[in-house]
Each structure stands twice: as structure tokens, then as C-alpha cells.
Design a protein with these regions (language model features):
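Short, acidic/turn-prone active-site loops that include or flank metal/cofactor-
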Residues: 1, 16-24, 78-80, 99-100, ...
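Class I S-adenosyl-L-methionine
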Residues: 1-75, 83, 175-177, 188
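Short hydrophobic/aromatic-enriched beta-strand-loop microsegments
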Residues: 12-18, 69-73, 92-102, 147-156
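Glycine-centered flexibility sites
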Residues: 17, 49-50, 56, 77, ...
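A contiguous loop/helix-start segment that scaffolds small-molecule binding in enzyme catalytic cores
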Residues: 29, 39-45, 57, 98-100, ...
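Structured adenosyl-cofactor binding patch, chiefly the S-adenosyl-L-methionine
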Residues: 80-93
Length: 208
């Protein structure tokens, strides 16, 4: 946000943001930059979107600082799943609907052994997928193969909380095509489960 950056106009700025599919600084280089700047006697602020310890690589950076003997503090943020859910009017939990919510990264291919999509499908709990837009068709296929009904309500929220926010609601089996037709791009989150149906019930009473 340029307005936030402007508050520190006299500071030295290092842009290390990441976007899927675009060239970016590797995480080890970011870790070392933090250590080097702190070692040079500078007060360093690592500004992140969302919560640094939830798919934000904050743990990697904190560990690098710890190993280098650099003291630090962590300020909590609002993770994208919470912010996007509220902005898209999709309650992540609802009495009588679910008692848990799964947060998972879709950055790797759906066939990656690091994520057991069949187990997630069998859990019966709704989920929010971070960084999964590029692999959405693979993820949907893996969840369906794991037993999740292709008719399961599914939504994609792009640029949630921002002026260009766009929300697409479909089903698990059709969401990849719906997202492509709508022209959604990163950053986007995917919501899967009956919680998505609550959006249609709540929207009519939403204040402008």
C-alpha cells in the first residue's frame, strides 16, 4: 500500500514481494538481507501482508534471525483467509455447518505428496486454499478423486478487501472454468465447502 510506504519515506526500502509465476528474490536471500541489515546496526521493519506466520515465511525469517543472534519482535496480522472471508461474506465457521476449517497451500502441484488431498476431502470440513489458483483444476480433480462431491459449493476471491475485489461462486467441478472465464488472477483464495452457500443468504442484507 503506497500510503503505508509513504509513512517511512526517509527509510531505505527493499522490495522483496512475491507473486506466483513472476521473478522474485529467493527466500534464503531475503533471510540474509534481514541479517545483514540488522548486523549493520539498522533498525529493520519487515513489512508483510496478512499474518507473517501463516504461509508468510515469517518462521523462516525468524529462525534465520535467531541463528544469527539478532533479536526481533513479531506483530500479528490478519491472515488472508480471515480478511478475504469477511470481505466476500463467507463465514469460515457457522454453527450447524462446520466445526473446523482447513487452511492449506495449493502452491505445489496437486500431485505433490506434501499435501494429502484425499485426506482433506475425506475430512468433511470446508477449506481455504492459499496460492492455489494456478493449480486449481489439478486440486479440484484431486479432491474429487478423494471423494469430495463435484457439486460442492466453491468460491474464488481475487484481491479481497481491495477496490478491484472480485468473487466467483461455482462448484468444485466447475470452478476452474468459471475462474478462467472471469479472468481472475493472483492473489486469490479458494473457499470450498457448504460455508460458501451462506454468502447468497447474507448478501441481500449487506449494507453498501
Amino acid at each position: 500500500d503506497p500510503t503505508v510506504i509513504a509513512l517511512a519515506e526517509k527509510a531505505e526500502h527493499h522490495f522483496v514481494g512475491k507473486r506466483g509465476g513472476r521473478p522474485s528474490i529467493k527466500q534464503p536471500a531475503i533471510n540474509q538481507l534481514l541479517v545483514d541489515l540488522a548486523g549493520a546496526g539498522k533498525r529493520v521493519l519487515r513489512l508483510k501482508g496478512g499474518d507473517p506466520f501463516l504461509f508468510g515465511r515469517g518462521g523462516d525469517e525468524a529462525l534465520a534471525l535467531t541463528r544469527a543472534g539478532v533479536p526481533f519482535r513479531v506483530l500479528p496480522g490478519v491472515t488472508a483467509a480471515s480478511g478475504a472471508a469477511a470481505a466476500a461474506v463467507i463465514p469460515t465457521t457457522m454453527r450447524g455447518v462446520n466445526k473446523a476449517i482447513i487452511l492449506v497451500t495449493g502452491h505445489a502441484a496437486a500431485s505433490d505428496d506434501d499435501v494429502d488431498w484425499a485426506a482433506l476431502a475425506a475430512s468433511g470440513q470446508p477449506m481455504v486454499i492459499y496460492m492455489g489458483l494456478r493449480n486449481l483444476s489439478l486440486i479440484a480433480a484431486a479432491l474429487t478423486a478423494g471423494g469430495l462431491d463435484p457439486a460442492t459449493p466453491t468460491a474464488a476471491a481475487m484481491s479481497a478487501t481491495l477496490p478491484d475485489q472480485k468473487v466467483v461462486v461455482s462448484t468444485l467441478g466447475a470452478i476452474a472454468g468459471a475462474v478462467a472465464r472471469a479472468g481472475l488472477h493472483a492473489p486469490s483464495l479458494i473457499f470450498i465447502g457448504d460455508i460458501v452457500d451462506l454468502r447468497a443468504q447474507l448478501l441481500p442484507a449487506l449494507a453498501p
